[in-house]
Amino acid sequence: MARLPRWEPEDPKFWKETGSAIAWRTCGITTFSLIFSFATWFVMSAIVVRLPAIGFKFTTMELFWLAAIPGFASGTLRLIHSYFIPVLGTRPVISIATIIKLIPMVWLGYAVQDLNTGFWTFMVIGFLSGMGGGDFSSYMPSTSIFFPKRLQGLSMGIQAGFGNFGVSVVQFVTPWIIGFAVFGAAVGGPQIFTKADAIKGAITVTKDNGVVKDVVINKPELASAITVVKDGNVVKDVVFQETDTIKGIKVDVKKDAAGKIVEVVPTKGIKVDVTRKPTGEITDVTVKNVIKKPMWVQNAAFWYVPFLILAFILCAVFLRSVTVKARGFKGQFEILSTRNRALTHSWNCTITYITTFGSFSGYAAAFPMMIKTIYGGFDGAPDPLAYAYLGPLIGGLIRVITGPLWDKWGGSVGMLYPILGMIGACLALIFGGYLTPTGLEKFPGFVYIMLFMFLMTGTANAATFRQYPIVFAYSPAKGAQMLGWTGAWAAYGPFIFTSLIGMAITKTGSAIPFFAGAAIFYAYANFLNWWYYTRKGSERFDFGNSGGTWWDKLSDGEKEKMKHIDLHQ
């Protein structure tokens, strides 16, 4: 039976005899599917940092746009998904949402193998990848409907927490899985990956008004391989020539009959980069150690295919749908009505969810590119993907841990203090000089502060899963809608955060303007949370199962009145 005829999770007898097993089975299967939804959503953010190294000529801002566009798609799609579950049910929505993500993954896998693939093609693929984030607004409402209020913080914390591990999965697995031919030649050959690091102290460059006047070779072993050509007091050229001990960089590539690369032999050597003005004057000279090796970037997309197929089968076979009172798609917009002050609380919840999950997803998408652009220009620059997975991992894990705590102590309390921590992290980044470093000595501190930011966003986000159904306690359907609605707007986080950080860096040279604005926004959100939900006597307070909620304090008559108002009665 695809649709369950009866579902009363608040009935203790029904929950014990029937509901609990079905609800936890549903949570387990949908969480497995959600992991790979998040992974496919963020796969572009992991791939973009590798595109320049395999030959794609995109600007820094274009790379930020590629990392951002899945977030734009996910936010837009969540606005649609937020109304699906009450109307269509869990089984068809989650099943279709799972299998359709094969389209962008397969397309992306082939696109990265062709250096002629244009920026706008990648933008379309990135937009489609956003389907993996869009369906989150179907997962959360589904889970909220299946569980009683006392377990909603726990169940949704588990689902969102483990589901968010998908972000860590993509950023952790990608560097490893693109390093070998996991699928053989079945899905294509390798690309040529180039890594070039400046040799510290190899040369001393003297400039006058931005033009190189002299180049002194400091390392004796390089003196016989590098020739500085001068005309008077101006350097005209710097020429590199191999010696018996100093080798240039050569690439040994084997191709098939169609001209496609089938093998790349790893090589390393020395390269001299000479930067010139359009008029020919030399503006910079660097000597680099260059490594070229094979890389199978397509694996970063293709390896999700079997897992998506497995998740689809599990969803189609084992999931069930619950009948929820809904008044069609038009009725779903009643969370924006003035009845029972729904509009006010919809606005408040949207702001706080953007603050929590919007920040988590936004920083998760932007973190690799932040590392690359802020610290990637220094000698021995860190690999962004070696650190990027840590933030989402911490943020996802803390959701699972703190979900039960906010059931006990209250969602509004669980949001108040972590948001203060987020404000502190913004100020530390700004005033600690971590956004305008002069060397790598600031990098460890930058990483620690960003990981603290992820910890705080995850903690606060876990509290929302408890709080929002309590705010709309008079209508389980509206509580489910609110989780979908707020999730839709917060899913724009990767788009907004990544694009604004990229713009700030491009236009001002640092991300300081972004984090200053973020701190102000967080302060506003925390004020709303305190005024309406946390302070003594607030309108819809939530002090957890131990301290009670606004709904618990109402009389039966007051509760029935709110329900009648909600239903136009």
Q: Which ranges hold each PLM region?
A:
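Flexible cytoplasmic inter-helical loops of multi-pass small-molecule transporters
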Residues: M1-W7, A186-A196, T275, G280, ...
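Cytosolic juxtamembrane N-terminal segment immediately preceding the first transmembrane helix
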Residues: M1-A39
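Extracytoplasmic gate region of multi-pass secondary transporters
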Residues: W41-V49, Q171, A342-G396, N461, ...
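Glycine-rich segments within core transmembrane alpha-helices of 12-TM secondary carriers
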Residues: G133, G153-G179, G484-F497
